[in-house]
Amino acid sequence: MRLTALPAFDDNYIWALVANDGRAVIVDPGQAAPVLEAAQREGFTPVAALLTHHHADHIGGVAELQQHFPALELYGPDDERMPSATRHVAHGDTVTALGIDFAVLEVPGHTRSHVAYVGDGHLFSGDTLFSLGCGRMFEGTPPQMFDALQRLASLPGETLVCCGHEYTLANAAFALHVDPTNAALQRRQQEAQAMRHAARPTLPISLKSELATNPFLRLHTPEIRAAAAAHASISITSDVDVFAELRRWKDAFRA
C-alpha cells in the first residue's frame, strides 16, 4: 500500500491510497487531471472516492472521473450540495475499500456536514484539521469546531494526518506568533521550509507532532490560554472560548 499526495489548484492535495494490485482510493478529487495523469503514470485504477465536504475544490473532478471510471464508488455526507456522493455516510459508519475499514467521523465546523475518514493509520481530515492550524468556520460554530478538533485529537498519536491543503508554512507564521518559545514548533517550521524548498509536501504529519505544535490542539496549555487572553484583553476560562478567540485572531492575522 502506498500513499501519494497529488497537487491540485494552487495548494490543494488530492490523496491517492494505492494497493499493490493497482486499485486505488482517492480522497477529495477537486480536479480530475491530477488523478488521471497519476493513474496513467503509476498504473492504478480508482475504485472508490472518499469525499469530506461539498466545496468545489474537493469534489469538482468527480464527474470527469466517473466518465473514465464508471464503477467508481463515491462516498460522502448526505448533503444536497453533494449530489456526486452516491453512497451517503454518517458518524460511526465504516467504508470498506481495498480491504481497509475507514471509520467515518462527523467533524462539522468548516461546513455543517463535513466528515473525516480514518483507516490504515491515516486521517483524511479535509479542511477541518491542517498542519499547525484548522479550517475556517464557514457554516459551523466555535463549539462545533472545537468538538470536531477534540475528536480528531483523541486518535492515536501515530496516526498520519493527511490534510486537504498545503498551508503549513502560512500556519506556522501564526502559530509562532502565538507560541514563540515552542521548540518543537520552531523545528517543524524549519523542516517544512526545507521540504517546500525541495518541492516536497509537508504532509502527511503525525498527530503526535501536531499535538505538540498546533495551537488549535493546545488550547489547554498555559502558553496558548495566556496568548488568547492577552489578545482578547479579557479573562478566558474555557477551552471553547480560547478556541473562538484564537480562530478570530487567525482570521485577521497577516504575517
UniProtKB/Swiss-Prot annotation:
Cofactor: Zn(2+)
Catalytic activity entry: an S-(2-hydroxyacyl)glutathione + H2O = a 2-hydroxy carboxylate + glutathione + H(+)
Enzyme Commission number: 3.1.2.6
UniProt keyword Zinc present: yes
Record SMART domains: Lactamase_B (SM00849)
Annotated disulfide bonds: none
Top EC class, one word: hydrolase
Matching Pfam families: HAGH_C, Lactamase_B
Domain of life per record: Bacteria
Bound cofactor: record note: Binds 2 Zn(2+) ions per subunit.
UniProtKB keywords: Hydrolase, Metal-binding, Zinc
Pathway annotation: Secondary metabolite metabolism; methylglyoxal degradation; (R)-lactate from methylglyoxal: step 2/2
Binding site for Zn(2+) 2: D57, H58, D127, H165
GO biological process per UniProt: methylglyoxal catabolic process to D-lactate via S-lactoyl-glutathione
GO molecular function: hydroxyacylglutathione hydrolase activity; metal ion binding
Positions bound to Zn(2+) 1: H53, H55, H110, D127
Assigned protein family: Belongs to the metallo-beta-lactamase superfamily. Glyoxalase II family.
PANTHER family linked to this entry: HYDROXYACYLGLUTATHIONE HYDROLASE, HYDROXYACYLGLUTATHIONE HYDROLASE GLOB
Complexes and interactors: Monomer.
Record function comment: Thiolesterase that catalyzes the hydrolysis of S-D-lactoyl-glutathione to form glutathione and D-lactic acid.
Protein name: Hydroxyacylglutathione hydrolase
Species per Swiss-Prot/TrEMBL record: Xanthomonas campestris pv. campestris (strain ATCC 33913 / DSM 3586 / NCPPB 528 / LMG 568 / P 25)
